[in-house]
């Protein structure tokens, strides 16, 4: 199916201070927003799509001045696609602390005239949800037909259903978890350590030195990317293949240059990421991942944490996702069913690991299409 076509982002400015979970507040801030489709007269067909770590408000479509910059979930959102923009008004919001136009470490601190850098406050999933709620208010949307997200975006969708139960009809959580495991926190710590130990980091104030801690960002991305793929997927894509010119002998070089195809792939991904992403943003977002644990306020009891939810849920996981394994989704499903919530759960047999939520898998997309048809029928009832 074709893309939704040319889209244009908009910047929303908010002057009312935003209270943050750390006890401080953000006095004034911008959020980058993109919308697709048409909001109906009743304002009842809106869907909020929450983004994952390195994504943004640019969910679907292309920009007129850069047609190669395709939205990160373009295969999911658009006319005739599972989230059909002929039926729904879809909103993408770039979260606070990001590096794609919303207020973050790269933004100018009005009190100093310099980039916030390391002084930008640590933000949480809950802070993002509160900021997104203000975007909804600007559109006059009192209740979303659905809030949807994959990975970290799924955590935001879950948080929406818990923080604003009266504003969410359906909550769609894909390849996500109600909290990070110790192993996942450990992966994030190793990635952050790579950035913090880069000589170009300068305590987070590298903008003043006109440098970027690219070496640390490369390693951080390489670590992360390994966790996004399954072992079978990596074996199929790369195996133990060596990088060799055509006709060259299949022999080792006995040095530390790139020899295996998988090494080349990881370095390419790391280089690409370091060119466009911001190191301070990476630190902030991974820490927000670490902190997300809505059951913490209930002595670790997830069932108690979801007691006041009212939404209907679609929870989807992928069999080869070892970053956020299906067991984590089943834990959430059980907690919701303990309160007799309406829950649809799908555990999809897909070989691509955590990144499967971004791919065009027929079973996965058919599930989403059918679920959104159900929501459309409710909206139009």
Curated annotation (Swiss-Prot):
It holds the Pfam family Abhydrolase_1. InterPro entries: AB_hydrolase_1, AB_hydrolase_fold, HAT_MetX-like. One of its GO terms (biological process) is homoserine metabolic process. Its EC number is 2.3.1.46. One of its GO terms (molecular function) is homoserine O-succinyltransferase activity. Pathway: Amino-acid biosynthesis; L-methionine biosynthesis via de novo pathway; O-succinyl-L-homoserine from L-homoserine: step 1/1. HAMAP family: MetX_acyltransf (MF_00296). Transfers a succinyl group from succinyl-CoA to L-homoserine, forming succinyl-L-homoserine. This is Homoserine O-succinyltransferase.
């Amino acid at each position: 199916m074709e893309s939704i076509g040319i889209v244009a982002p908009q910047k929303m400015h908010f002057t009312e201070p935003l209270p943050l979970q750390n006890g401080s507040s953000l006095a004034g801030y911008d959020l980058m927003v993109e919308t697709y489709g048409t909001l109906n007269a009743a304002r009842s067909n809106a869907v909020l799509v929450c983004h994952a770590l390195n994504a943004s408000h640019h969910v679907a479509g292309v920009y007129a001045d850069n047609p190669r910059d395709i939205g990160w979930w373009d295969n999911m959102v658009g006319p005739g696609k599972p989230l059909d923009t002929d039926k729904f008004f879809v909103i993408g919001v770039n979260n606070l602390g990001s590096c794609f136009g919303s207020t973050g470490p790269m933004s100018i601190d009005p009190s100093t005239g310099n980039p916030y850098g390391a002084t930008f406050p640590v933000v949480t999933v809950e802070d993002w949800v509160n900021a997104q709620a203000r975007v909804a208010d600007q559109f006059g949307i009192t209740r979303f037909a659905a809030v949807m997200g994959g990975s970290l975006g799924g955590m935001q969708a879950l948080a929406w259903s818990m923080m604003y139960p009266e504003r969410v009809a359906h909550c769609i959580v894909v390849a996500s978890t109600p909290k990070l495991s110790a192993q996942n926190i450990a992966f994030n710590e190793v990635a952050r350590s790579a950035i913090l130990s880069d000589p170009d980091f300068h305590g987070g104030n590298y903008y003043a030195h006109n440098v970027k801690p690219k070496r640390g960002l490369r390693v951080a991305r390489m670590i992360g990317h390994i966790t996004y793929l399954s072992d079978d997927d990596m074996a199929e894509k790369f195996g133990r293949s060596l990088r060799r010119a055509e006709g060259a002998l299949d022999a080792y070089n006995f040095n530390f240059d790139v020899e295996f195809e998988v090494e080349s792939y990881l370095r390419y991904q790391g280089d690409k990421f370091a060119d466009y992403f911001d190191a301070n943003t990476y630190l902030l977002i991974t820490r927000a991942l670490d902190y997300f644990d809505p059951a913490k306020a209930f002595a670790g009891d997830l069932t108690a944490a979801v007691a006041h939810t009212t939404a209907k849920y679609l929870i989807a996981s992928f069999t080869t996702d070892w970053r956020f394994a299906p067991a984590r989704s089943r834990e959430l499903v059980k907690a919701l069913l303990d309160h007799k919530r309406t829950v649809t759960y799908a555990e999809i047999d897909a070989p691509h690991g955590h990144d499967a939520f971004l791919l065009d898998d027929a079973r996965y997309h058919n599930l989403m299409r059918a679920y959104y048809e159900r929501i459309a029928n409710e909206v139009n009832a």
